[in-house]
Amino acid sequence: ADPPGGDISTRSPPRGLAPANVDFAFSLYRQLVSSAPDRNICISPVSVSMALAMLSLGASGHTRTQLLQGLGFNLTEMPEAEIHQGFQYLHHLLGESDTSLEMTMGNALFLDHSLELLESFSADIRRYYESEALATDFQDWPRACRQINEYIENKTQGKIADLFLGLENPAILILVNYIFFKGTWAHPFDPQSTEEKSFYVDDTTTVMVPMMFQSSTVKYLHDPVLPCRLVQLDYVGNGTAFFILPDKGKVDTVIAALSRDTIQRWSKSLTYRLVHLYIPKASISGAYELRGALAAMGIADLFTNQANFSSISQEGPLKVSKVLHKAVLQLDEHGGVEVAATGGPLQLVSEPLTLNFNRPFLILIFDDFTWSSLFLGKVVIPA
């Protein structure tokens, strides 16, 4: 498959959703970065898109239109049925068993148990999104939190626990979306080369982190347009990761320029170079209540008394109390045992470059086949 930088407008089945999904991804990423400028950010935009598209099956009227248009879909060009079929296919492709990839993603709706759920809605979210709506007693808030946490812990085999720490006050309808990802590098790092090194958080803060190292031929670019350098590292399977090192103090400049066009330009401009590469070993995670970010992006009706969710339940005015998203990304040395450590085509003519991710950096992970943005991350302090 072409890289995510290929022609993203192509309407082949797994890619029909890509333009809208990628545009939504960068909009959401920028909202969250601007709301927490000094914090790590880790989101899985494609799984948030999937969750909101699923929710639209229960919406009617303006609420439904606003949800789908807010996700970037032009409803005159793409019929609604095609959107849900596209996500159904995407969910199937991303969820196919790839032994080299540990990835668990999913959505669930928790609905106050006093409301009667429409069977047609349950059937639709099961069919298209392999999801379910669960009755919850929100009057007993500690127990409701426990139910949601246990549900997600079970679904992720314990990889994601305690999503619901510190959330309180009454609710009627909560949309939960989660993803855990740990890929296998096509060209692994040698664990014996990992050493504690300094990471410069800012001018006054330095922390020690385990720093992975490899010297190999990788796709590299010193961007002539934006103040950054980057490498593209492939996972076994369809995953590919861009590690972007902005010049000192230029993180915000690079984030502001992230777009489909930028990714396409990078993909065309990267060339194989021999690089001494240092990347922190870390587990990066983010937990978000997305109400503020979505409202700022024009997806606001669902949280207000204007909401129309008559396709979920016909009892009563119903609005969404919270949209929760939890993403966990593990970066470690491991590669496929069967992969020979050769890297890309050898270019012995070039002097080796050193690229050291020892200050705040960005990471973008795409699924190459579907052009889905699996993860967008900003790493201020590797954890």
Swiss-Prot record:
Keywords attached to this entry: Glycoprotein, Lipid-binding, Secreted, Steroid-binding, Transport
Similarity remark: Belongs to the serpin family.
Disulfide partners: none
Annotated PROSITE patterns: SERPIN
Site (Conserved cysteine within steroid binding domain): C228
GO cellular component: extracellular space
Domain of life: Eukaryota
Comment text on domains: Proteolytic cleavage leads to an important conformation change. This reduces the affinity for steroids.
Organism name: Oryctolagus cuniculus
Biological role stated in the UniProt entry: Major transport protein for glucocorticoids and progestins in the blood of almost all vertebrate species.
Record localization: Secreted
Glycosylated residues, chain numbering: N74, N154, N238, N308
Residues annotated for cortisol binding in this entry: Q232, Q264, W371
Keyword hit for Secreted: yes
InterPro entries to which the protein is assigned, alphabetical: Serpin_CS, Serpin_dom, Serpin_fam, Serpin_sf, Serpin_sf_1, Serpin_sf_2
Protein name per UniProt: Corticosteroid-binding globulin
Any one GO molecular-function label of the UniProt entry: serine-type endopeptidase inhibitor activity
Tissue: Produced and secreted by hepatocytes, but has also been identified in a number of glycocorticoid responsive cells (it is found in maternal lung, spleen, and ovary and fetal kidney).
